[in-house]
Amino acid sequence: MIKQFQTELAGKTLHVEIGKYAEQASGSCMVRYGDTTVLVNATASKSPREGIDFFPLSVDYEEKLYAVGKIPGGFIKREARPSEKAVLTSRLIDRPIRPLFPKGYRNEVQVIATVMSVDKDYAPDIVAMIGSSIALSISDIPFGGPTGSVNVGLVNGEFVLNPTSDQRAISDIDLVVSGTKDAIMMIESGANEVTEDQMLDALMFAHEEIKTIVAFIEEIVAEVGKPKQEVQLFAIDETLDMEVRVFAKDKIVTAMKTFDKMERNERLDNVKKEILVHFSKQYENELKSIVEVINSIIKEQFRYMITHDKVRPDERALDEIRPITSEVGILPRTHGTGLFTRGQTQVLTVATLGALGEVQILDGLGEEESKRYMHHYNFPPYSVGEAKFLRGPGRREIGHGALAERALLPMVPSQDDFPYAIRLVSEVLSSNGSSSQASVCGSTLALLDAGVPIKDMVAGIAMGLVKENDKIAILSDIQGMEDALGDMDFKVAGTDKGITAIQMDIKIKGIHKDILKDALEQARVGRLHILDKMKKAIDKPRPELSPFAPRVLKMKIHPDKIRDVIGSGGKTINRIIDETGVKIDIDNDGTIFIAAESQEAVEKAIIIIENIIKDPEVGQNYTGKVIKIMNFGAFLEILPGKEGLLHVSNIAHERVNKVEDVLEVGQEIEVKVMEIDQQGKINLSRKALLPKESKAENTKEEKA
């Protein structure tokens, strides 16, 4: 049976259709907001997946180029691997729903959101997130939602719900929030140095709207929702659990109290081996269950130490930040480098400057066609002491790179002020938590070292949370164990004036305003501390670019002159490139960017272009080059791309019978512009510059 539902969201109609499409999926809905339409399907396996100790949830956000009336490029003409935007949106969908499945649920669950149509004023990512919650909620899959999701902007000091394309362009906040009716589950935001209070107000504004969406979804579930399936949850035998705890608890607690991550891991591994050997005969077929009990003990003891003893594994105070060192100028031939070390987390970020023609071309569903500022994050296995195959960047690496990119973006100078493409690559050399925020700090150092005139320095910090009933501990600068065993990973980046990026993921069923407020304030204090440490290495951009960086200059010409610079079939611009070795990029408004390895090459290209766009003037003298000889005269190039006719009667005072007797191709002579007619044709005279006693037969002495 086909059912339709609708509600108002930000003054616009959100329309949901159920029962018409994909009837074999466990839960399916077509969600339309404006003209943006997304089909979302949720399915689950009938039985648990064997041999795993995690919940196998997969989320895919599919961008179909037909949604914006495009045919994919390339030879195959079909969508290839997901774009960066698609990967990031898949993560946005995944993060708020993952904590809401039952503990011990091991059935495979797949959510697929397919973008069918896109209206630029109605963001498809928000529609897909709402649709995913609906599909799971109406299905028979045991999901503890529903959740709601919104986008919040800050335009002229006012919060705007689900801003339009034009509003997003001028907004000081780009905030995506997901949550249940009770609490916030996920935050993703970029911002233009907003204060902690402004960000908190934006989050509370978002949550009020989320409650409305959740109520709407609950109405849908009440009418068309399926009964939830009875599922088999993974559980450990109580006797085994008790025996392992009695034998192992004290050993694990002793092993955990170690400052160094590698030493702690080694001691815990040795304890695990001892425990497994001890129970190997008694529970020969339950070794995986024993490992799970061990991991549970580690988690419980960690959380008890934090909430009751107020002691962290490395003996830091809850708000204490690990020792920090910063260096710049590490690599001799790169354009800029920054090495940021915080405890056992170390990131080397390298900045590369390029011509604007080297921007990243985006072929997706968004309005952006290119990206001038890029950040790539690499997490090799040696950074955590492992040996694995090297593969392309995964979703985590793409997500961390995008977060660091977003954190610095408001500080990057405009194209007019700094006409370069900028690429940053963060190599994680050692990781014990907070590597993405170390990448933010390394990026700032590398940009300053490269001489990029960023508006201000940016630092990042990762905050954690451990919540046991009414006991709450907020942790500054979390390390790996605290990230893995805690309840929250709350990353905050910004300047000393305000926040530029936020990302929050939680493992519990939401957090409330007071926790968010305290975490934001504690993050602010930590961020300022980190900035002070970074300033000891470098506190302003280098006055000069690296000698190995390209030189880029820009010039402005009248848009009507663009065709003259490019020439027929690109002949003129290619000739300039061949002669000077520069790279040239031309905007439609007549702005020309010229890049080369040397200043001399750039200046040479500018002179050539200036001559090309220069218009001949009547009465002015020019050195012309003979390019073609005809019976009635000769054609001369007097400026690049500018040709004029020297009629045979204007070659000399005397009569010239054959032009070839006086001129030859390639010869350079002085001529005067006598006339430019209405069609732009130029008439030249050599005779006007010759004394009357001059003899035509002597003129070949002038030939070059």
Curated annotation (Swiss-Prot):
EC numbers for this chain: 2.7.7.8
Disulfide bonds: none
Xref: InterPro entries: ExoRNase_PH_dom1, ExoRNase_PH_dom2, ExoRNase_PH_dom2_sf, KH_dom, KH_dom_type_1, KH_dom_type_1_sf, NA-bd_OB-fold, PNPase
Pfam families for the chain: KH_1, PNPase, RNase_PH, RNase_PH_C, S1
Source organism of the structure: Alkaliphilus metalliredigens (strain QYMF)
Subcellular location: Cytoplasm
Role played: Involved in mRNA degradation. Catalyzes the phosphorolysis of single-stranded polyribonucleotides processively in the 3'- to 5'-direction.
A GO molecular-function descriptor: polyribonucleotide nucleotidyltransferase activity
GO terms under cellular component: cytosol
The name this protein goes by in its record: Polyribonucleotide nucleotidyltransferase 4
Sorted UniProt keywords: Cytoplasm, Magnesium, Metal-binding, Nucleotidyltransferase, RNA-binding, Transferase
Annotated S1 motif domain residues: 619-687
Reactions listed under catalytic activity: RNA(n+1) + phosphate = RNA(n) + a ribonucleoside 5'-diphosphate
Top EC class of this enzyme: transferase
Domain KH: start-end pairs: 550-609
Any GO BP annotation: RNA processing
Binding residue positions for Mg(2+): D483, D489
Keyword Zinc: no
Family: Belongs to the polyribonucleotide nucleotidyltransferase family.
Cofactor: Mg(2+)
Gene3D superfamilies (alphabetical): GHMP Kinase, N-terminal domain, K Homology domain, type 1, Nucleic acid-binding proteins
Record keyword ATP-binding present: no
